[in-house]
């Protein structure tokens, strides 16, 4: 994965790529973090090893992008390696790319809201479809309740289709396969 590809991805896709392909999942997590009281010389050697380890990772760019969006790194203390970058490097990159990162974070949040709306509608549609109208009041009353339920189901399905179609169009799917 390239940096350009990673920059275009939303947070859940970056996270999934990292979860599926990161080399560090089998490594000792302590390699990537400075221990309390660790000497600068020892940390520099460990940091160099961690950075080298990251450079062989197929999802390094995704990890770096997520680290930038998450605000990892500290301008006062170099205490971690993520995405093949030291904490200081992440801070510097974040400052250089502040405008792009702000836009990416905003898009992530909008995507999260859209996803939440999509899942909320799907859950509500499922609930409504499983609901059994009351049997009290006789057949005419039950028929009216069923008609209302069917109208509500059609309304929810239409709302769900609008959100799903917009989401697919925005992400380049246009038509589902």
Regions found by a protein language model. Name each.
Residues 1-14:
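Polybasic, low-complexity association/targeting segments
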Residues 11-58, 64, 68-75, 87:
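Immediate flanking context of iron-sulfur cluster ligation sites
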Residues 45-48, 65-122:
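Polybasic, low-complexity binding patches
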Residues 58, 79-80, 168:
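Compositionally biased, low-complexity repeat tracts
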Residues 93-174:
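Short flanking/linker segments adjacent to small metal-binding domains or redox-active Cys/His motifs
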